[in-house]
Amino acid sequence: MSIVTIPARNEKSPFASMKGHHVAVRVPDFAAAKRWYVEKLDFRVVHEWPYADQRLAYLAPAADDSFFIEILGDGQPGPIPKPGYQDLGDSLRLAGFHHFCLNVADMDRTIAELRRRDVAIVTEPFELPVIGRRLAFVADPWGNLIELAQVLA
């Protein structure tokens, strides 16, 4: 159970219809990124389309239809490479987008399977009691960080 208290919803806000939809991830190689997210994380390809000299796709987690990753790949100039992180502390010093988070039911099982699939584990699982979560961080081959979060019992 989460210890984070969510304030009451503001249904009267002019922005009440806003809901999260996707996070865009820029990669240099569209086909390789799509393949990585499908093969390593079991994401499903929802839709693909071209835009100028780039290729884009919405990818959804294996059993979640409410959150997408939008892959933006190819095109010129290519994206500026992200640095390789040795640990989470290194990454927290950079401005801008940091990571996206995926909830998991069993952190140990998830990390074991990611390790079996040769996914880079950036930070081993650790507990953060102040938010009632057990967290870990992994990275795709292009340095995009993915947080994994399990609610502490």
Q: Model regions: which residues?
A:
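Acetyl-CoA-dependent GNAT
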Residues: L72-P77, Q150-A153
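Core segments of cupin and vicinal oxygen chelate
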Residues: F15-S17, V25-E70, D74, R116
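Conserved catalytic-core motifs of GNAT/GCN5-like acyltransferases
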Residues: A24, R44-Y51, T123-P129, Q150-A153
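Short glycine-/small-residue motifs
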Residues: F68, L145-L148
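Active-site beta-strand termini and strand-to-loop segments that position acidic
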Residues: L59-D64, V138-P141, V151
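Vicinal oxygen chelate
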Residues: S2-V4, V27-A32, I80-L145
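Residues that flank catalytic or metal-binding motifs in active/ligand-binding sites
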Residues: K19, R55, D65-F67, R93-H98, ...
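N-terminal beta-strand motif that seeds the catalytic metal site of vicinal oxygen chelate
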Residues: S2-A32, A52, F97-V104, Q150-A153
